């Protein structure tokens, strides 16, 4: 047995699909594209989510969730965080560096027993302590 006698395993090599090469192939005339219409034309690509005229899934399902228009206040417990006590000046940017709170947060409220003692260090209008309004 030589290299010239080697063959691939039976069923491992598929015959390529040659479309539009005559009626005898079974894939002539319309070249497996069906009849006429938009999908038979070259360059046709359905939009993402298009379901052939049926109401798309993303429009059939109800909208969920609610993003309030009210201001978002982030609470930080001072008793659990010694790093805030060690700051000389408490600003919004310094608190953001310590606590990675989301960008949509508009204000910070310091809570806990020691929060009132830190009121003199606060240098930003967006920061309040418990007891302040």
Curated annotation (Swiss-Prot):
SUPFAM superfamilies xref list: Ribosomal proteins L15p and L18e
InterPro entries: Ribosomal_uL15 (IPR030878), Ribosomal_uL15/eL18_sf (IPR036227), Ribosomal_uL15_bac-type (IPR005749)
GO cellular component, one term: cytosolic large ribosomal subunit
Region (Disordered): 1-64
GO biological process: translation
Keyword check for Lipid biosynthesis: no
Keywords recorded for this protein, A-Z: Ribonucleoprotein, Ribosomal protein, RNA-binding, rRNA-binding
Domain of life: Bacteria
Molecular function terms from GO: rRNA binding; structural constituent of ribosome
Family from the record: Belongs to the universal ribosomal protein uL15 family.
PANTHER family: 50S RIBOSOMAL PROTEIN L15, LARGE RIBOSOMAL SUBUNIT PROTEIN UL15M
Complex and partners: Part of the 50S ribosomal subunit.
NCBIfam families in the cross-refs: rplO_bact (TIGR01071)
Job of this protein: Binds to the 23S rRNA.
Protein name according to UniProt: Large ribosomal subunit protein uL15
Species annotation: Helicobacter pylori (strain J99 / ATCC 700824)
């Amino acid at each position: 047995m030589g290299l010239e006698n080697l063959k691939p395993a039976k069923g491992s090599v598929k015959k390529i699909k040659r479309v539009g090469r005559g009626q005898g192939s079974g894939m002539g005339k319309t070249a497996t594209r069906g009849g006429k219409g938009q999908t038979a034309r070259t360059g046709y690509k359905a939009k993402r989510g298009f379901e052939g005229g049926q109401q798309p899934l993303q429009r059939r399902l109800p909208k969920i969730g609610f993003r309030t228009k009210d201001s978002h206040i982030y609470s930080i417990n001072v008793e659990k965080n010694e790093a805030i006590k060690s700051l000389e000046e408490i600003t919004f940017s310094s608190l953001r560096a310590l606590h990675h709170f989301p960008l949509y947060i508009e204000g910070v409220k310091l809570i806990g027993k020691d929060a009132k003692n830190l009121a003199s260090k606060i240098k930003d209008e967006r920061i309040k302590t418990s007891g302040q309004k």
